[in-house]
Amino acid sequence: MNANLIKIFLIFTIPLFALNISVTILPQKGVIKSIAPDVKVNVMVPPGNSPATYSPDFKQLKAIKNSQVYFSIGVPFDKKYLNKIKEINPNIKIVYFGKYLKTSNNPHIWLSPAFLQLEAKVVLDTLIDINPKDKEIYLQNYKKYINKLANLEVKGFKEIKQKAFITFHPSFYYFAKDFHLKEIALQKQGKAPSFKYLAKVIQIAKKEHIKTVIIAPEFPKKYAKIVAQKIGAKVKVISPLNEEPTKTIEELIKALQ
């Protein structure tokens, strides 16, 4: 087979084996890429946008049409657009991570090392199911990722010295739960806090000697800064929507030392 024929063969065969996966938010991409670096991942809610309010553009909807799998994380975006996604691509396999929310309506499960282990296993099984020829590669990367998460858990329990922290939106609920911490969120049911509630939080924070207020750049900073100033706490800006959730967890551990 001459060189030109080989090129033509590659052009027409490579797309047949290309894996295209769609996810709701950026942290899901980080997990998938840790296990399958060569997979193309379409993120429906781009960085800097809220999963509660974002609407997908034409390019993203087109990517859905070419995707074999959609990983749903359970945020408001999914509830609004999953039916539309099924209409665009009736053959797409949808994996619902939201079903693992057993006792809480808080969807921010991707910052829990315990959940990330579960997510990684579901991703692994799904990838092997649709592309069994790369099973060994996926398994090897999966084991590395699980070890990384296990080391993070050890690091967190060893280095975190604070018992509680304040944030605006309850993005870090499952992180706090995993490490036996108390997260005090200023936002209640999606609404800004009243002055009465702010005063209550300030009183609690002083009583419990809370030293850290964590601000997520995707949400208003005003109220968190007011509380931080009143209690003399340090302010840490940490996004819950970074691509690699293990790095976000490392940032949180460092902030709470």
Walk through the language-model features, giving the residues of each.
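Hydrophobic alpha-helical membrane-insertion segments
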Residues: 1-3
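Extracytoplasmic metal-acquisition and chelation regions
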Residues: 19-257
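Sec-dependent N-terminal signal peptides
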Residues: 5-17
